């Protein structure tokens, strides 16, 4: 029966979550304070590291005794080079296996690097936050929440009670995929491979969901998307099984679909089995207990009973080794149990190793260590695959940070030829890797060599280790939990280069490089997973761990580190990345920095490996990007790498001979040659031994190597060829012989070097042509070509390897047979022989004839088209054919031929074809896209890249002519006639489709510039292309008018956030923009930032809005300051011009505005506004400024009234004084206005508007300056001022209470009566407010606190004390003045008022107490 899965998608939440949150920006500060081991190791290719004599010439090389890979003398150049490639491959494949440097013993060898060092083995490249929607679900969880990672598909998951949510953590705004059909709390989730033959092929994984009652299996379809991520779909399988009494916390799966379970209640291992359909004696899904089969599985364990003698034991993890069919379990008692998966449903426990056994093994190997005692626990296991090590099986991590490497053996392994595939029977500790030293004692000598100190067995650097993960070939991640809320992540990797260059006579050591990955504060690591394919440089232990061999062939390893805040992506740095970054640091360093770095690499990794890395970097490798993502290396770094390759590559020399070898055979080629061979070998190592084709069912032919991989390899080889060609004049062995006389030995050595380098060049040429041939082969119908071959040729094609195709005569001969078959097939299908031959010449280059033949054919087709002007179908076919032919030879078309063709296309109204041809020619003339790099670099003068741009410009100018002609030919023509597009509309649409669909960025920039020159800005706004944005963004940096155009572009597409960003950046820029215009820009930016934009999170909007608001506030202050200074009569006119030039432009810092202008000019109101904008926190300074502002305002008001009185009296004003038009306000009124202005602009900020201290100041001003009833003012005007500003009644009363109680001047003696009057006035207004609204209503309506809406007993007590104060004043007055009747009456009236208010307050308090007792 056909395997089938029910195709019903799981219902769930598909929510568009907002973008991840970022840290809130800190408020800016106010003002800046005014400043008053032995010999060098040999390399595998024969060139040993040696000291560098100078930066101009490499030093002498030490003969290692290893023969440099050389070829036989009687072979042709390509075959010689191929032999060198094979020898180099063999050397790379002989890299030591893990067992050889993890032999019995212990080590603490690390070379620690800081996280920001160019030598750091890992670095964080991206961080993806957990979506806000997930946090909302997590916060809503009631019973149990859990996070996890499916790194192999790029997804994370969260279980909240009985719901499960998955999301693509690489997506900035991921969609949540939910499973909410579980009825019980989810305890564990795992993604495992499906069992073959059970589901349809679209099911790529099985999602196992364990709850407290059952275990559910869901089908998962993970399909790749164009962006490189995975699209996930869940399907119900209707497969579930009852969980039983055992807990399920750990779920693992094997590659053949078996699913094992374990939990934290016991150490039992369960297995879930499932099948396509039910059978007689088995259901579709079931569960087996492999630890206690049968009835024992349901009998309670004695350990759980009160009389149980043993401590309760449970699992801490399950781990699968598919390469050995082993399952490991780890318990809380650090016991490791090994199970062997013998058959499809059988699981047998073969080894149980407890902690005591490990301690005993350690005692046999090394002295005691405080890191490995009976209190030490094992926290994690990591299986070591059989492809990586034949002896070592497992790595265990202790909570003290020690790595224990354990081997497992069977009895058969002790016999000669014993079967090693049998289940192991014993396990033994082989090697211990201790943590790095807490204080590194490793030192580096002057020549860069490292001297190791003794074994350190006491370091607590990794204590306590909470989690640990090991990935092949030894990438180690250790989560160190020294602080309760902060994890530290230690990562290390084998130092492959040092292991590789260890001398044969020396014992191999487990050299490692380590570093600490810095995580944000508060991060707790939950899980770490490998997101790229597992590492494997070989299929067997020997050569498996050679990272250097595959650094140009495989993507660097990437790892997802899941924390409670998100997923951190950590990437492995290859040696070429480290070298490139180290050279990048030398760009701006001293002259001898390059020598120091190269010396360091040579001493550590050998000269050949170093020079190979330099060559790779010079060819564009080492950009620290993933393989295939394009070049990212800067030119300065490439130049330094080129210098290192040329200057430190060494020289060929004659070795000492015993006389049995010929002179030429005793030549030791230079490290430069060996490095070139090494780099070339590593570029082609994937395909070198691979077969070209694979034959499937029905003679279906496919490529064994993906064509994209072939293209990448070809591009890298071509870069290498171009590099050698461009620098051949300076590379010894490629350059012409020097004029100085050589000795015979030097001459022979240089000839041999030249021959070897020439052979490698010929091989590179053959590789490039061979790949082109294969690509062309698969562009054709290769199955038809295969069918046309005879049986012998068919078999030869099936057996053909790339090595044979590139370098061997039989492969070349077979290629000629295939070429003939291709031509015959095309002839049979009616194709022209010349067309086929041209394709072969273009793709392979070996059968090249002048491109003029194709050009003539294209022109012939164009001429025939002009004769068919009235036969539209034939005309279109001939025009299309001519365009196709022209595009084939676009790179060789002369400007004259191109111009003629375009003119003919225009005459035939083939506008789209004319534009397409010009675009193709422009691209072919500059295939390296150097014109774009020249434009991106700002079009520097006297640059060789300008020539490429000029050649492109010729094509673009022709496109302008075509578009001009198109518009003039169809000017005034209607777009539609009878509802159908006219010929004019069709031609215009075709032409502009070609224009807008072009991927030529340089063309788009040129086109938009032409549009602007012609005033067609509306066309730019109507184009939906990323190139428009890039173009306008560049112009916006230098032109305010174009920046406005960019804002219009954004707003017309509802991209308000980007528009706000542009406007904010413009306001902050140094462009010639007035301050008023900057205020307008910031006002618009604030408005645009307030509008919701799709894809922009609320927090991003708030951040931008906050920034624009702050800048707008500063700009308003600067504008006020500018207007005040320009109108200030104290400032000379020439100084005003300077001020206007400085302030009427870029927004200045608050420091400049305060120190240079506002403070010096005594603009105290502006000083207070600056304090507010800067979040200034000095209460003394702020209060002093208020005092100065009040005194200044009082003086100005009195002075204006004095001038008014002079004018009214007909007198003359002093010179320079402007006569007032209307009567100026009284001083207290003017002071009130100033206070109101500051209050409104600072929104009663408690720092700038401190009521507790400001209200007494204003009250004291009123008393000291007679601003009371004596001038007709309301005696209580200060209190009314603050209450009208919205200051709470309670706060005003409390401040007045403090004034009354402290009795500080001027509130002493009889003036305390005025304070009582203010208190009575404030309480009276408060009582009225409470009575008007009602206490609870007032609290609900105004949002005030309880003390504001509901009076406390303290108010009644205050009124009582106020009455006592009045009594005292009355008594004092009677004694001093004999009891004047008017004063006594005034006090008596005030006392009656106070007593009445006290009764009102008591009544309110009584009502409130009654309500409280009622509800109580």
UniProtKB/Swiss-Prot annotation:
GO BP term (any one): protein localization to nuclear inner membrane
Disordered: annotated span: 1-26, 50-69
Keyword set includes Protein transport: yes
Domain of life: Eukaryota
GO cellular component, one term: nuclear membrane
Topology within the bilayer: Peripheral membrane protein
InterPro entries: Nucleoporin_Nup133/Nup155_C (IPR007187), Nucleoporin_Nup133/Nup155_N (IPR014908), Nucleoporin_Nup155 (IPR004870), Nucleoporin_Nup155_C_1 (IPR042533), Nucleoporin_Nup155_C_2 (IPR042537), Nucleoporin_Nup155_C_3 (IPR042538)
Record-linked Pfam families: Nucleoporin_C (PF03177), Nucleoporin_N (PF08801)
Record keywords, A-Z: Membrane, mRNA transport, Nuclear pore complex, Nucleus, Protein transport, Translocation, Transport
Assembly information from the UniProt record: Component of the nuclear pore complex (NPC). NPC constitutes the exclusive means of nucleocytoplasmic transport. NPCs allow the passive diffusion of ions and small molecules and the active, nuclear transport receptor-mediated bidirectional transport of macromolecules such as proteins, RNAs, ribonucleoparticles (RNPs), and ribosomal subunits across the nuclear envelope. Due to its 8-fold rotational symmetry, all subunits are present with 8 copies or multiples thereof. Part of a tetrameric NUP192-NUP170-NIC96-NUP53 or NUP188-NUP170-NIC96-NUP53 module.
Function: Functions as a component of the nuclear pore complex (NPC). NPC components, collectively referred to as nucleoporins (NUPs), can play the role of both NPC structural components and of docking or interaction partners for transiently associated nuclear transport factors. NUP170 probably plays an important role in NPC assembly and organization.
Protein name according to UniProt: Nucleoporin NUP170
The species this protein was found in: Chaetomium thermophilum (strain DSM 1495 / CBS 144.50 / IMI 039719) (Thermochaetoides thermophila)
Lineage: Eukaryota, Fungi, Dikarya, Ascomycota, Pezizomycotina
